[in-house]
Swiss-Prot record:
This is Aspartate aminotransferase, mitochondrial. In eukaryotes there are cytoplasmic, mitochondrial and chloroplastic isozymes. It comes from the Eukaryota. Its EC number is 2.6.1.1, 2.6.1.7. Keywords: Aminotransferase, Cell membrane, Membrane, Mitochondrion, Pyridoxal phosphate, Transferase, Transit peptide. One of its GO terms (molecular function) is pyridoxal phosphate binding. InterPro entries: Aminotransferase_I/II_large (IPR004839), Asp_trans (IPR000796), NHTrfase_class1_PyrdxlP-BS (IPR004838), PyrdxlP-dep_Trfase (IPR015424), PyrdxlP-dep_Trfase_major (IPR015421), PyrdxlP-dep_Trfase_small (IPR015422). Belongs to the class-I pyridoxal-phosphate-dependent aminotransferase family. PROSITE patterns: AA_TRANSFER_CLASS_1. Its main location: mitochondrion. One of its GO terms (cellular component) is plasma membrane.
Length: 428
């Protein structure tokens, strides 16, 4: 019977080959309308770098720390924490929806300080998330579902590229406020205040807690104070993104200053945290999302809804990275070592900034490069124009994003002179 049916099929298509007949009988594609998406701008830089055979090539696009030999760096405190965890021979059972409790508690304590009134009163809730991106998305989903007063979220201009799709895909309406001043490669306080004064009440405003990405430009404490007062006057909901605590200045308290100050001034903030950079746990995806509430009862209600949001997305977070971070944060000797290592990473980046400016002067550059050392954190907005970036890529095999942002973590004692020479060549 099967053979009969097969022969009928073949005869019905006349002189066509059996292969063509089978292809015609297949269902048409469901996905003919799907267009090819654009490549990720950061990953595209890395792919081009990999194809380059120039021995002097530099990849200044990727936001991951490198040591002074240009190699990936695993912290000693992380290795020791891993050894302690392995020795315990722990199980691999599911974590609760909200994550590892020891981690969540230590995570928010690191951000707010262990003696913060918010923690003592129990009026905050922290859930473990899938690093900073996961934290932002859970936060965006929460705001989208429960902040009925406004669908608008105001991002600094510019902001981290992923902020836009995270909030957009959560159903928020994207707006912007002035932040960066291209003429000075610094912070535009007047522009920021002017724009914030016009933001409709109860809108959401996103703030980078420290080491603004991509510019490396942070407000000074007195500027933060002006912003906090105006934001409170405008009755805006503050969403802090803190991906670089300790990694910016080398001091965890200094880097968390803005977050703590806003809370002191009565802002019930949302807070996203990541341990990718400051613990080097990039692939472990360790983060936290915190909501500061009116009181403990409100915090419990918020927690219940966060769990409901998390459950259909990833059910519960991964445990290994959270165990590592919790072990470091809760073990005094490891915590002390980690603080030293964080400062060491931050200090190396600061030193590379200084060496770059020094070598630019040696090259004879007459441009003002003070913004390179004024900026803070992993990234530097160089002020280079797109055509200058193209020359750096094509003539010197120095790869970066088109906006002139460089990852200072990719600069080393061995290649900083070459970088300065190349920048001078395209800017003189």
């Amino acid at each position: 019977m099967a053979l009969f049916k097969s022969s009928k099929i073949l005869s019905s298509v006349g002189s066509q080959t059996p292969v063509l007949a089978v292809l015609q009988l297949r269902a048409s594609s469901w996905w003919t309308e799907v267009q090819m998406g654009p490549p990720d701008p950061i990953l595209g830089v890395t792919e081009a770098f990999k194809r380059d055979t120039n021995p002097k090539k530099m990849n200044l696009g990727v936001g991951a720390y490198r040591d002074d030999q240009g190699k990936p760096f695993v912290l000693s405190s992380v290795r020791k924490a891993e050894a302690q965890i392995a020795a315990k021979k722990l199980d691999k059972e599911y974590l609760p929806i909200g994550g590892l409790a020891d981690f969540s508690k230590a995570c928010v304590q690191l951000a707010l300080g262990p003696d913060n009134e918010v923690l003592k009163s129990g009026r905050s809730i922290t859930v473990q998330t899938i690093s900073g991106t996961g934290s932002l998305r859970i936060g965006a989903n929460f705001v989208s579902r429960f902040h009925n007063a406004s669908r608008d979220v105001y991002l600094p201009k510019p902001s981290w590229g992923n902020h836009t799709p995270v909030f957009r895909d959560a159903g928020m309406q994207l707006k912007a406020y002035t932040y960066y001043e291209p003429k000075t490669c610094g912070f535009n306080l007047k522009g920021a205040l002017d724009d914030i004064s016009k933001i409709p009440e109860k809108s959401v405003i996103l703030l980078h807690a420290c080491a603004h990405n991509p510019t490396g430009v942070d407000p000074r404490p007195e500027q933060w104070k002006e912003m906090a007062a105006l934001i409170k006057k405008r009755n805006l909901l503050v969403f802090f993104d803190m991906a670089y605590q300790g990694f910016a200045s080398g001091d965890i308290d200094r880097d968390a200053w803005a977050v703590r100050y806003f809370i002191e001034q009565g802002h019930n903030i949302l807070l996203s945290q990541s341990f990718a950079k400051n613990m080097g746990l990039y692939g472990e995806r360790v983060g936290g999302f915190t909501v500061v509430c009116k009181d403990a009862e409100e915090a419990k209600r918020v927690e219940s809804q966060l769990k409901i949001l998390i459950r259909p997305i990833y059910s519960n977070p991964p445990m290994n990275g959270a165990r590592i971070a919790a072990t470091i944060l809760n073990t005094p000797e490891l915590y002390k070592e980690w603080l030293q290592e964080v400062k060491g990473m931050a200090d190396r980046i600061i030193r590379m900034r200084e060496m770059l400016v020094s070598n630019l002067k040696k090259e004879g550059s007459t441009h003002n490069w003070q913004h390179v050392t004024d900026q803070i954190g992993m990234f530097c907005f160089t002020g280079l124009k797109p055509e200058q970036v193209e020359r750096l890529i094509n003539e010197f095999s120095i790869y970066m994003t088109k906006d002139g942002r460089i990852s200072v973590a990719g600069v080393t004692s061995a290649n900083v002179e070459y970088l300065a020479h190349a920048i001078h060549a395209v800017t003189k």
